Amino acid sequence: MTLTHHSTFIKGIEGSAEGEIEDVRQTTVFDPPFYGHPMLVPPSPSLTTMFRTRSTTPDEEGTAIAEIDQQDWDIMVKVPTYEYYGFVMYLVSMLGFGVYIVWALTPAPVLKFFEIHYYLSRWWALAIPTWLFVLVIYIHVVLNAYNTEVLTKPFSSLECIVDQYALVGEEDGAAHGRVVDLRLCDVNKQQLEET
């Protein structure tokens, strides 16, 4: 019974609605996990290459591809290099971190047993992360000092003077509703009373 129901459904699709389905398939964009909603970033070329609607083999007639179709085809077959580079960078960073952990924590006799003699001193295993931590703190202090000392205008600057002719922005408190946290039972009671 389900097989005949399924076959009649397919026949219905192949009938008059076939053109409409093709139009929908060509105009919609596959954008997980927000089905039916626009993506926040443009779709990557990898999604368009995974879900091709056009055949990759030429037609039997051997007709030339129109210029607009050729541009669409060039976009569809573009290699998604950003995804590949990101995955390779992930693998390389994990491999580098693993090598660093092995180098820092494995005892020297074990490394010599595996004929690994050319490695840096263990002092660098602590020195490099410590230097990086101090560098981050230094950058934080320098950026704050730069923002307050260089980018902030002095008090004697004309841009800091406020008088009766200055156009100072005023906040309209009445336009914004007061934000109050209510108990969940009160919110539910209010919603149920409205319905």
From Swiss-Prot:
Pfam families: PIG-P. One of its GO terms (biological process) is GPI anchor biosynthetic process. The chain crosses the membrane at residues 85-105, 123-143. It is a multi-pass membrane protein. GO terms for cellular component: endoplasmic reticulum; glycosylphosphatidylinositol-N-acetylglucosaminyltransferase (GPI-GnT) complex. Has a role in meiosis. This is Meiotically up-regulated gene 84 protein.
